[in-house]
Every structure is written in structure tokens, then in C-alpha cells.
């Protein structure tokens, strides 16, 4: 369960932003979307390598 402590006089919108950030970090929604359809381990591994290549390429272009 996610708990967001509120300080005295803190804006509700700030608390909602904190909650959303914490919720995103847990990865619940991402996991649920991933489990909607079975994906073979080989496909998952291929996606990871392609993403790693893409990120590495972006870092090289940045330099």
C-alpha cells in the first residue's frame, strides 16, 4: 500500500503528484499490461537487447 504523508497546509495537488510518482515506480500498471498476453522469453530477451542497442545509440549521438 502506498502512503503519502501530508504536511500541514500542503496542497492536495502536490500530494497527488507524489502519489502518482510512487505508483509509477512500483510498476504495477506496466506489469499488468505485460501480463495481458503471454510473451515468449525469447521475444522478451530480444526486446531487451533491441532497447539496449537503441539507448546506447542515443548516448553515442548525444556525445
Curated annotation (Swiss-Prot):
NCBIfam families xref list: S21p
Say yes or no: keyword Metal-binding present: no
Which GO terms of type biological process are on file?
translation
**Highest taxon listed in the record's lineage:** Bacteria
- Keyword entries, A-Z: Ribonucleoprotein, Ribosomal protein
Q: Which family does it belong to?
A: Belongs to the bacterial ribosomal protein bS21 family.
Which residues fall in a coiled-coil region? none
Q: List the disulfide bonds.
A: none
Q: Which residues cross the membrane?
A: none
Q: Name one GO cellular component term.
A: ribosome
**A Pfam entry, by short name:** Ribosomal_S21
Q: Which GO terms describe its molecular function?
A: structural constituent of ribosome
Protein name, entry field? Small ribosomal subunit protein bS21
